[in-house]
Amino acid sequence: MLKVEPIPAFQDNYIWAIHDGHSAAVVDPGEAAPVEQFLAQRGLALGAIVITHHHGDHQGGVSDLLARHPSGPNGEPLPVIGPQGERIGHRTQAVREGDTVTLRHPAVTFRVLDVPGHTAGHVAYVGDLPGAGPVVFCGDTLFASGCGRLFEGTPAQMLASLDKLAALPGDTRVYCAHEYTRSNVRFAQAVEPANPDLAAWAARVDILREAGTPTVPTTVAHERAVNPFLRSRESTVRQAVRAQGGDVSGDAAAFGALRGWKDGFR
């Protein structure tokens, strides 16, 4: 049986730890110290490092972790998995869509999806974990009620990436890498103020955050219901974008206008 737990880092990052009570794989360790503390508190060995994209707040802790854990639980070199199309330090396995990642400590298998947009070579890892069920680790592509900024990709690329994630089974748990939900929900409500699912979710987010509790993971089905970036083809979203002066002449144009609105939203 596997557990997935968040390791808070920086101001709003989540490093995800997948563990079996003995060893852990960590996803997007932007800094090492919180990971070391988590491992020590739970008596876990570090078994693998998994990276979704090249930004420093997702891989900045790899060097320090390898200095402390050069080998895995059985003495083999510690695996560092990362996207083929990006600059990933210390990477031992480069992956792209269609590849399978098989970890030993803990025993985990992922299939890889290419999800460019936030960065050019961003990937996501999809699996069905014993005890945790279907999961996707999606870095900064899909957030709870939002999506990542387009630093390197185009609106068409990001829309295609989000379509790919939205097509996963509805009960897939979405493990994103930031606690941006409150601000994302404020924007989503500006886009779809009459969405009842969103209203209920906004109230829930306030309760969770006031208690200091993460709002993630959510599920793919939940995101389809409340996330404007998965709903950019809906008439309500198109009307809101048009009211802001956005171009809704096509799917990519409407998505780009929606993303541009969010970029300037306060």
Curated annotation (Swiss-Prot):
Protein name (Swiss-Prot/TrEMBL): Hydroxyacylglutathione hydrolase
| Provenance organism | Cupriavidus metallidurans (strain ATCC 43123 / DSM 2839 / NBRC 102507 / CH34)
Q: Name one GO biological process term.
A: methylglyoxal catabolic process to D-lactate via S-lactoyl-glutathione
Q: How is the cofactor bound?
A: Binds 2 Zn(2+) ions per subunit.
Catalysed reactions, semicolon-separated:
an S-(2-hydroxyacyl)glutathione + H2O = a 2-hydroxy carboxylate + glutathione + H(+)
Q: Where does Zn(2+) 2 bind?
A: 57-58, 140, 178
CDD domains recorded: hydroxyacylglutathione_hydrolase_MBL-fold
Gene it is expressed from: gloB
Query: Which keywords does this Swiss-Prot/TrEMBL entry list?
Result: Hydrolase, Metal-binding, Zinc
One Pfam family from the record: Lactamase_B
Q: Upper taxonomic classification of the species?
A: Bacteria, Pseudomonadati, Pseudomonadota, Betaproteobacteria, Burkholderiales
Checking InterPro entries in the record gives: Clx_II_MBL, Glyoxalase_II_hydrolase, HAGH_C, Hydroxyacylglutathione_Hdrlase, Metallo-B-lactamas, RibonucZ/Hydroxyglut_hydro
Q: Which domain of life is it from?
A: Bacteria
The Swiss-Prot or TrEMBL record lists the needed cofactor(s) as:
Zn(2+)
Class of enzymatic activity (EC top level): hydrolase
By sequence similarity, the record places it as follows: Belongs to the metallo-beta-lactamase superfamily. Glyoxalase II family.
